UniProtKB/Swiss-Prot annotation:
Species in which this protein is naturally found: Arabidopsis thaliana
GO molecular function: ubiquitin-protein transferase activity; zinc ion binding
Family: Belongs to the RING-type zinc finger family. ATL subfamily.
Gene Ontology, cellular component aspect: membrane
Record EC number: 2.3.2.27
Chief place where the protein resides: membrane
Subcellular location field: Membrane
Free-text note on domains in this protein's UniProt record: The RING-type zinc finger domain mediates binding to an E2 ubiquitin-conjugating enzyme.
Protein's name in the database: E3 ubiquitin-protein ligase ATL15
Keywords from the named record: Membrane, Metal-binding, Signal, Transferase, Transmembrane, Transmembrane helix, Ubl conjugation pathway, Zinc, Zinc-finger
Length: 381
């Protein structure tokens, strides 16, 4: 279709030139036209030039179709769909293998104190926001920001790491920069070397376009991401500078936590199971409080007895203040209502915790005191 339109254009232009030549030709005494040798030569040259241009156009189009692997019999739509078929992104099933989790579950476990940001929308992550982790490079994004990129590209938008899974090859669980944090700079792995080569690559293309439909409700710090991403790949920066700048976009976790995130995501493959990460524990016997959820208006306290067993009871933070007991497998309740373990040791002492307002208005002298209630009477231990 394109070739025929070009041939018709050349033919029309040639006929126009022929009319000009005929109009400029000489007439003899009998009224007949006579062509001079110069006019004949001009006509032959013009016909030859246009014929050569047509042949070259057809040849170049055939070569282009062969280079792109297109079939000439596929219809006119093939010429328009060349750009769409040359840039495929990641499959949806591959994108789902990248773990997603709330930021609050890893905020206290991450290595480093620098604020963590999304490189696309340039917003700091909040506790209730969901993160998507790229296992190959440990960069984190909002799912609405990175999913649009991954559907059209196969690399990380920051470090250009290849995210296409290789059959038979497991996903790398090496955390970049972990050796530097722990002081083991002498231990170098091929994964770290490959990542450094990617970071110092001359390919400095930035994110061209991102669909913002998933994060339109979040305020943006800038209408464009080019200026902030450009400083990561500035030619004047040293080889170690890009990696330093990427720290605020990199989630560094302990190795076992990182492996648990990646393996749980690969295992569920579309299931909506909740990920349970280990909590920090203290080896010192004593008391510890924690939240049971703001919607329940409870927080729990934990007590370690002399035998090292854990005693956990929730405490209401709304009047009337009371405690509820959570019976462990090692505890039973006798007929009088007192707690006993299976060995017969009494656990009748219930901890009474003052409200935060009482702690605020009491002096420092009583700040560290704890009281115990037994059958409604307070007696210190």
């Amino acid at each position: 279709m394109v070739v025929m339109s070009r041939v018709s254009f050349y033919s029309s232009f040639l006929l126009l030139l022929l009319e000009v030549v005929v109009a400029s030709s000489e007439f003899d005494d009998e009224g007949r036209t006579s062509f001079s040798p110069t006019t004949a030569i001009i006509m032959i040259v013009l016909v030859s030039v246009f014929f050569a241009l047509g042949c070259i156009s057809v040849y170049m189009r055939r070569c282009l179709q062969h280079a792109l692997g297109m079939d000439s019999g596929g219809g006119p739509g093939n010429w328009l769909n060349v750009r769409q078929t040359t840039e495929p992104g990641l499959d949806a099933s591959v994108i789902e293998t990248f773990p997603t989790f709330p930021y609050s579950t890893v905020k206290t476990l991450r290595i480093g104190k620098e604020a963590l940001e999304c490189p696309v929308c340039l917003n700091e992550f909040e506790d209730d926001e969901t993160l998507r982790l790229i296992p190959q490079c440990c960069h984190v994004f909002h799912p609405g920001c990175i999913d649009a990129w991954l559907r059209s590209q196969t690399t990380c938008p920051l470090c250009r790491a290849n995210l296409v899974p290789v059959p038979g090859e497991s996903v790398s669980s090496e955390i970049p920069g972990l050796a530097r944090e722990t002081g083991q700079n002498s231990l170098r792995t091929p994964i770290d070397d490959n990542r450094k080569r990617v970071l110092t690559s001359p390919d400095e293309r930035l994110i061209d376009s991102v669909a913002w439909t998933g994060n339109q409700s979040m305020p943006r710090k800038s209408m464009s991401t080019g200026w902030k991403l450009a400083e990561l790949y500035s030619p004047a920066s040293s080889p170690g500078q890009p990696e330093e700048n990427l720290d605020r976009y990199t989630l560094r976790l302990p190795q076992e936590i990182h492996d648990q995130l990646v393996n749980s995501s690969l295992g569920k493959q579309g299931s909506k199971g909740q990920l349970a990460l280990p909590q920090e524990r203290s080896s010192v016997r004593g008391f510890r409080t924690g939240s049971l959820g703001t919607e329940k208006n409870y927080f729990y306290f934990e007590r370690f007895d002399q035998d090292g067993r854990l005693d956990r009871r929730p405490f209401s933070i709304t009047p009337p203040y009371h405690t509820r007991s959570i019976q462990s497998p090692d505890e039973i309740i006798n007929a009088s209502g007192n707690y006993q373990d299976r060995a017969g040791a009494p656990k009748g002492l219930l901890l009474a915790i003052r409200s935060p307002f009482d702690r605020l208005f009491t002096g420092k002298k009583n700040a560290g005191e704890r009281s115990y209630l037994q059958s409604g009477d307070a007696s210190p231990v």
